[in-house]
């Protein structure tokens, strides 16, 4: 479960708006570890539709390691609430995941964001990560 905070907003004459934001919440990985996710970024919306999105997220993982991801709006399908993110940095065994592009799905209910991410990784990498 993730919370969204709009930090700035600019309205344009065509009805579109530019926002900066922060997202915080918890996530679970398929290996059973948990993480606290902190993101910041910006987005452009028009008529309630997402036009562009950029975001960087930092995950503090329950095994005392870290992972960073990047979301860019040109690989997302806003109407479905799905998109792609790339793992851009990590510590420890998670360095094996850097460079992977993953898929996410999200939905917002009462200002809370529910999200799920899926990353396909080689079995050898999964086994290394799952040992933690």
Task: Locate each region found by the language model.
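Beta-strand-enriched cores of mature, soluble protein domains
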Residues: 1-132
């Amino acid at each position: 479960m993730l919370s969204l905070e709009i930090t700035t907003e600019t309205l344009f004459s065509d009805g579109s708006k530019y926002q900066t934001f922060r997202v915080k919440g918890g996530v679970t990985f398929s290996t059973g570890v948990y993480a606290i996710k902190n993101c910041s970024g910006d987005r452009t919306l028009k008529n309630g539709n997402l036009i562009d999105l950029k975001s960087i997220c930092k995950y503090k993982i329950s095994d005392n390691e870290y992972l960073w991801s990047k979301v860019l709006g040109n690989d997302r399908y806003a109407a479905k609430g799905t998109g792609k993110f790339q793992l851009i940095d990590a510590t420890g065994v998670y360095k094996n995941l850097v460079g992977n592009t993953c898929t996410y799905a999200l939905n917002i209910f009462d200002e809370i964001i529910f999200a799920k991410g899926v990353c396909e990784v080689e079995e050898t990498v999964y086994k290394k990560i799952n040992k933690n």
